[in-house]
Regions:
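Noncatalytic alpha-helical scaffold of FAD-dependent oxidoreductases
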Residues: 1-268
Length: 268
């Protein structure tokens, strides 16, 4: 189909409750709509050619009897940025859980307020402090993930459940016999770290901007809902535009074809 599978901020749909942010509170009951799986497995996939992921996506959506539960894409540059600039967030969530995040944000807010009384401290001092402290913590990412990042530009986390695990394993083994790239099946620890790394990657953009605010200019983010049948999903910018970009981070959801693309423009 040449229509998107998912829309973000589609103004045509922002009516009623959806168009009343800050005005209407909605309470709902969450119920299970699918049977709870007995087991799950995360597949970590890498390639240097986006066309390989295009073909894998098509094969899975068209031919698989069991569809994935999750499929998150991350470009190598985004992986690197998240590893460096979201490391402290990763560690806090891994050790203390997401429930601690409101407390952490409150601590950061108070530190930033106090730091304004000291002219020699940089703006958003809490970000500078947490970034500095994170350097003393050892590498938090599994070796196999690191090896894939070194070998491949494009990374894809796919979670399968129950019968879909064997179906995906057989498919990937066969596919990568004849195509560039590779995959591995994550251990439980690798699965948690892969998903958490992808989760905190969104924060790397803001952290980088806070630390480098003297060297960069404008920043902007785009959520792009691609048509279901779009094959050229990975953006390649013209040289004249690429040369003006200081940082760009690409990540997204390949199965529903939504890409999150963040850019920071060079000063001047």
């Amino acid at each position: 189909s040449n229509t998107p599978a998912r829309f973000n901020s589609d103004k045509r749909l922002l009516y009623g409750v959806s168009g009343s942010a800050g005005k209407v509170a909605v309470f709902a009951v969450r119920v299970n709509t699918y049977p709870k799986p007995n087991k799950s497995k995360v597949f970590y996939i890498g390639t240097n050619y986006p066309d390989n992921f295009t073909q894998i996506r098509k094969d899975i959506l068209v031919n698989f009897k069991n569809l994935p539960r999750l499929g998150d894409y991350m470009h190598k540059d985004c992986y690197e940025a998240a590893k460096k600039y979201s490391k402290d967030s990763f560690i806090v969530i891994e050790k203390l859980g997401t429930k601690f995040l409101p407390t952490l944000f409150e601590i950061k807010r108070k530190v930033d307020l106090l730091s304004k009384y000291f002219k020699f401290l940089p703006n958003k001092f809490s970000d500078h402090l947490m970034q500095f402290l994170s350097k003393f913590y050892p590498n938090h990412l599994p070796k196999r993930m690191e090896n894939f990042k070194d070998k491949y530009d494009h990374l894809w986390i796919i979670e399968m459940v129950d019968d879909g695990i064997e179906e995906a394993k057989v498919y990937f083994e066969q596919y990568f016999k004849n195509n560039e790239g590779d995959f591995f099946m994550c251990t439980e620890n690798e699965s948690k770290k892969a998903m958490l790394h992808r989760y905190v990657s969104a924060g790397a953009f803001g952290r980088y901007q806070s630390l480098k605010n003297k060297t960069n200019n404008e920043s902007f983010s785009m959520d792009i809902a691609l048509p279901r049948n779009e094959v050229n999903w990975f953006e390649n910018l013209p040289d004249e535009i690429e040369s003006s970009i200081e940082l760009k981070l690409y990540y997204g959801h390949l199965f529903c074809h939504v890409m999150h693309q963040n850019y920071i423009v060079k000063k001047g």
